[in-house]
């Protein structure tokens, strides 16, 4: 029995399912989840001392690679001064100033402790600002586990009140309308019918929770136009894309300005952090300035601010994101070439330093249906073959992958060699 198998059995005694977040359980790919004990640069090391090139990156935050020396030094320095004060600090102001300078749409920002808190708070703020109850989200887009966002799409143009988790009251979920991602016509039709009741549209500008689906040409522009037309707040959920697809996030990458944005992952440099912000007029509704309440004991805690500030400063150097995007492109091109040579139907998607892998014969992946039509069973086999080859991919066919600045030519060769063997075995 491996050390991971032993630890997983032990974990299940007191942790539901043996994990503290469901995707970690490997249910989508089968087998025993790996337990890691160390991470450095582009690598993670499991409890049996096997090293893997890591394309999960703690689900996105580790854009500098694991254990960057300057980030660790910043955290160690803060440790000498205490863990948390529950009071304002100079670093919070410095962080707010930096975030607002990097993301032009952010005129004011509020720190929280997770991406879920950020999206939950942004939606409450949009409702308070507009005085409306309904929200629109899209198929396959995940915005955290707050009740109003755990709603899935059904068939037809518009689905109301279909909770995708037990414990979400139907009366609460009925205010969430779910539309097809990349379908601006559905948005136009819905807003024409019920636009006066809609507080906000929340969208992942790149859908990173059905692997990696970039916006179709005109989709984000259409959302901006329709929100302006109907007085609806446009929220970009950049928890995943923020500071990754470009320094200014997806909104900078695609040139679209939302009213509110949510961030997480990279903004904390590996610590539990989220933030939300946007137009000063809207943010002025948040307590203590306005009537929309939001609070948090550990919001803006100094350890997280130290890690996040250092990370954002390091990734702000000229050329950083170009290097990341170039590596990601070379890796995906290499995978595609090897899949084609093996005769395996395969397609990739990319937005900066995030990517998607699909076992599909489609020319492109644009919709939720395209994603669901891909061969998840073949991905399972590919995942384990790559794992055997020393490459750790996201353990789900529906999660995006991430690269870091620590990935280089050596890691690229390991990845492509493992993929060549894997594709040959998948014939």
Curated annotation (Swiss-Prot):
Pathway: Porphyrin-containing compound metabolism; protoporphyrin-IX biosynthesis; 5-aminolevulinate from L-glutamyl-tRNA(Glu): step 2/2. This is Glutamate-1-semialdehyde 2,1-aminomutase. Homodimer. The modification N6-(pyridoxal phosphate)lysine is found at residue 265. Its EC number is 5.4.3.8. It catalyses: (S)-4-amino-5-oxopentanoate = 5-aminolevulinate. Belongs to the class-III pyridoxal-phosphate-dependent aminotransferase family. HemL subfamily. The keyword Cytoplasm applies. It comes from the Bacteria. Its cofactor is pyridoxal 5'-phosphate. GO terms for molecular function: glutamate-1-semialdehyde 2,1-aminomutase activity; pyridoxal phosphate binding; transaminase activity. One of its GO terms (biological process) is protoporphyrinogen IX biosynthetic process. Keywords: Cytoplasm, Isomerase, Porphyrin biosynthesis, Pyridoxal phosphate. GO terms for cellular component: cytoplasm. It comes from Pseudomonas putida (strain W619). Pfam families: Aminotran_3 (PF00202). InterPro entries: 4pyrrol_synth_GluAld_NH2Trfase, Aminotrans_3, Aminotrans_3_PPA_site, PyrdxlP-dep_Trfase, PyrdxlP-dep_Trfase_major, PyrdxlP-dep_Trfase_small. PANTHER family: GLUTAMATE-1-SEMIALDEHYDE 2,1-AMINOMUTASE, GLUTAMATE-1-SEMIALDEHYDE 2,1-AMINOMUTASE 1, CHLOROPLASTIC-RELATED. It is found in: Cytoplasm.
């Amino acid at each position: 029995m491996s050390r991971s198998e032993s630890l997983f059995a032990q974990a299940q005694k007191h942790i539901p399912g043996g994990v503290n977040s469901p995707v970690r359980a490997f249910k989508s790919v089968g087998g025993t989840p790996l337990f890691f004990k160390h991470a450095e640069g582009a690598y993670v090391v499991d409890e049996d001392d096997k090293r893997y090139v890591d394309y999960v990156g703690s689900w996105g935050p580790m854009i500098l690679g694991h254990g960057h020396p300057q980030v660790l030094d910043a955290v160690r320095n803060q440790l000498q001064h205490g863990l948390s004060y529950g009071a304002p600090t100079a670093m919070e102001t410095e962080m707010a100033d930096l975030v607002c300078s990097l993301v032009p749409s952010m005129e004011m920002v509020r720190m929280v402790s997770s991406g879920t808190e950020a999206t939950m708070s942004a939606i409450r703020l949009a409702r308070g600002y507009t005085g409306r109850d309904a929200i629109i989200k899209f198929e396959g887009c995940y915005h955290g586990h707050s009740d109003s966002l755990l709603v899935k799409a059904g068939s037809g143009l518009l689905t109301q009140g279909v909770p995708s988790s037990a414990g979400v009251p139907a009366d609460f979920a009925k205010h969430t309308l779910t539309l097809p991602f990349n379908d601006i016509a559905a948005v136009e039709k819905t807003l024409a019918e019920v636009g006066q009741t809609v507080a906000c549209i929340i969208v992942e500008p790149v859908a990173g929770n059905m692997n990696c689906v970039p916006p179709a040409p005109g989709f984000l522009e259409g959302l901006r136009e329709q929100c302006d037309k109907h007085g609806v707040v446009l929220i970009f959920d950049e928890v995943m894309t923020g500071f990754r697809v470009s320094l200014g996030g997806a909104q900078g990458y695609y040139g679209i300005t939302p009213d509110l944005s949510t961030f997480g992952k990279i903004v904390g440099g590996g610590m539990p952090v989220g933030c939300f912000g946007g137009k000063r007029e809207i943010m002025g509704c948040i307590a203590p300035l306005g009537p929309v309440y939001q609070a948090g004991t550990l919001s803006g805690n100094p350890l997280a601010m130290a890690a996040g500030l250092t990370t954002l400063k390091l990734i702000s150097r000229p050329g950083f994101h170009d290097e990341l995007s170039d590596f990601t492109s070379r890796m995906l091109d290499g995978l595609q070439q090897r899949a084609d040579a093996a005769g395996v139907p395969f397609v990739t998607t990319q937005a900066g330093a995030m990517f998607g892998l699909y076992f599909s014969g489609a020319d492109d992946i644009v919709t939720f249906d395209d994603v669901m039509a891909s061969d998840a069973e073949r991905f399972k086999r590919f995942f384990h073959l790559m794992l055997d080859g020393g490459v750790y991919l996201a353990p789900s066919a529906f999660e995006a992958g991430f690269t870091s600045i620590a990935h280089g030519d050596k890691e690229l060769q390991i990845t492509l060699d493992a993929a060549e063997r894997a594709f040959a075995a998948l014939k």
